[in-house]
Each structure stands twice: as structure tokens, then as C-alpha cells.
Amino acid sequence: MRIAQHISELIGGTPLVRLNSVVPDGAGTVAAKVEYLNPGGSSKDRIAVKMIEAAEASGQLKPGGTIVEPTSGNTGVGLALVAQRRGYKCVFVCPDKVSEDKRNVLIAYGAEVVVCPTAVPPHDPASYYSVSDRLVRDIDGAWKPDQYANPEGPASHYVTTGPEIWADTEGKVTHFVAGIGTGGTITGAGRYLKEVSGGRVRIVGADPEGSVYSGGAGRPYLVEGVGEDFWPAAYDPSVPDEIIAVSDSDSFDMTRRLAREEAMLVGGSCGMAVVAALKVAEEAGPDALIVVLLPDGGRGYMSKIFNDAWMSSYGFLRSRLDGSTEQSTVGDVLRRKSGALPALVHTHPSETVRDAIGILREYGVSQMPVVGAEPPVMAGEVAGSVSERELLSAVFEGRAKLADAVSAHMSPPLRMIGAGELVSAAGKALRDWDALMVVEEGKPVGVITRYDLLGFLSEGAGRR
């Protein structure tokens, strides 16, 4: 009889599936390694086994111990799945951008989940890295796998993922494409494929725009489980031959296309990897065989990527899940009012109240965001907002001096609304807010007010 003794015995051996509809004519063959068919639903199952076994062997993890790990969800599921059989408790620390769906999965496996802010530096006491370190110090018998520095992560992909790809393609693979998060997958599987092919296989990393791997400064992005704002020890930068930066917008759109056109319900980092793989396939030509690793499934993203309202709120929505078309949008209102305005009228926390009032008056606007970088900025880099009325009142009432920093007198950030949302949604939001910050593809692009909406409607909403 063929009966596994535990679900963890079924980790690995995931299939390759050819992509068809999303691949352009004349491009190379693109085969997806479908890692969501692991029992825990992701490629992180592989590293969980290796890390726990190594910790047990070294004595770092003792019977009845507690596993503490900062994770975007998938590593936690893999660790919980293996730990459950071996009697360990699990405490996982997640950034707040991780979907509630994914957090609930961890809880379902019996883990405790601690949520921390995303938009803070790695060494900030509130970051999910720092909080996990503190928990390890505070909990007796705690062990932190630290997937970002644990050599067993890359090793697991070197001994399983890489050999599986080589065997299943009969050594004909020409390119391997994978997203870079901790760096373990591309380091381990990529190193194996380079070695076994004598350097013939080209290794390509896919990375979110803003991540350090592709030359960014670690600026915020919304795709989960990939990219970083620091350099993990598990990542070997000598392995990838090329790294392709992919926007959140392109990643999410491809993720939705994979469900509609390829019947693959996968996560956002999978869409990102496929965007990069298709670029490689077009450049490599029809004789190439590109293997792209799809690390997880899409059921943990139903409230985000596969939710039209969430996609629209960030300005990512290109087509609705039901295929319906939209009428006049918030983006139309912004384009109608913009005229000669710069891309985003803004000020910075370090600028003075005098500077901010001058900017508001120069461009004839009543409110603007306070941002921590120069445009184009990400939504997570918006620190607050200022209005001409509030600043002038503060100055005349003696609560503010013109030489004060804006940071001392700014209000909370304006409510965000996606450029693709309907004008009716803006009308409802403006009942409670004087102004709204418009975001497109996750980036703030302007501000609309009640006055702007009334002007748009009075001039004829249908005129574009």
C-alpha cells in the first residue's frame, strides 16, 4: 500500500506545467514549477523540513520548544506543518501588509500571530525582524530559524528543487526564473542548475520595484513574500545572471490573468515571476525552455489581488473579474483638473510651514500630501497631509511659526482612493472627507476635493 505516515512526507516533487495563453507568439517555452501543490501550499515547506531537522541535530531546538519566525505567511505554514507532528509551539511575526487570509491560515494550524508595521526600517524596534528577536529572548526554549540567514534554506533547494527541474526537463532547461525574497530559492536551485549544466543554464531573478536586489533603496511595495530592504545572508548575489524589476501593477495583473487564462490560482509573487519569465522568453526565442517557479497559491489573496475593490482602491484595476467595463472614474476627475500642475503637488516633513504655504498658493491647491521622498512615491511613503486653511489658522492663532517644520503641524494622511474607482465612490467618500489622495498603480498621483468633483460633474462627466 502507498500510504504516507504524515502529510509532511509529501513535500517536494511538484510538477512542471506549460503556460500557454499568456505566452506571446514566437517566445520560448515557459514551464511553471507549481509549488502550491506542496501540502502546506508553498515552496517554503521545503526549507521548513531542513531547518527544523538541522536545529534538532545541533541541539538548538529541544523537545517542547517554541519556534519563532518573522514570516509573510508561507514559511510559517511550512514550519507549523512540520512542528505540529514534532510537538513544537509556533509564534510567527508578520508585517501588516500580509493579507488577513494568510494570517488566519497560520492561526488555523495552531500558531500564534503577531502583526507589525511594514513601513519601518529593519532595525526599528517595531519591525517584524526586531520583534521576533525580542520574542526569542523572552520565551524560554525559543528557537528562531531565521530563514534570511539560515544556510539550510538554500541547501534545501539545492538538493530538491534544482534536481527536480533538471530531471523533469531531461536537462533541456535553458533559463530558470524565480522571485527573490530571502534569496534561498534562487541561490540553492540556481547554483545546482549552473553546476549540473556547466554554466549553460541562465539564472534570472524577479524582484519588486523598490527592492534592493534590483537596485532599489528598499522603498515600500505591495507584492508579498519577495524583495527586501536589506541583503539577507541566505542570498548569494553571484548566482543570478540577471535581475528584472517588476511593478506591483504588472505583478497583480498577471496574477489575475494566470487564474483566468491558465486556470492557475496563484499569489502575487507568482505573477511577478511570470512577468519576468515572459520577458526572458521573448528575448531568448522559440528554442529556449524557461522554467519559472510559482511559489504559492492564490487562496491567501482573495481579499486583495482577487478583490476588485482592493485592486481599485490602489489604482491597480485594469479589468474587473466579471469582465464589466467602467464609466467615469476618479482618474478622469484628476485629469480634468490637473492642467499645468506637476505630477504630485507635495511637501516634505523637513520643509517649513512657510514653504508649505508657498507651495499651496503657487499651485492654487488647498491641500496636499506630506511625503518622505521625491515623486514617484509609494503609498507607504506618505507621512501626512497639510491644508492651507489649517496652516494659516495655526500661524495666526500662535500655534505655529512660519519657520517650524511641517512635521510638527501636519495632519494624518488623506484617505486614499484608486484612480480606477467610479466617480460615485468619490462622491460617497467626500461626504466625510474634504479631499482624497488619488493613487494609481500603488503610487499617489494627486488630490481631488469636493470642488473638483462638482466641477467635473458640472462640465459633463462623459466628456473625456
Curated annotation (Swiss-Prot):
Superkingdom: Bacteria
The name this protein goes by in its record: Probable cystathionine beta-synthase Rv1077
Modified residues (N6-(pyridoxal phosphate)lysine): K44
Reaction(s) this enzyme catalyzes, per UniProt: L-homocysteine + L-serine = L,L-cystathionine + H2O
GO molecular function terms noted in the UniProt entry: cystathionine beta-synthase activity; cysteine synthase activity
UniProt keyword Lyase present: yes
Originating organism: Mycobacterium tuberculosis (strain ATCC 25618 / H37Rv)
Mutant lacking the gene: phenotype: No change in H(2)S production, no change in basal oxygen consumption (respiration rate).
Cross-link Isoglutamyl lysine isopeptide (Lys-Gln) (interchain with Q-Cter in protein Pup) placement: K428
Family note: Belongs to the cysteine synthase/cystathionine beta-synthase family.
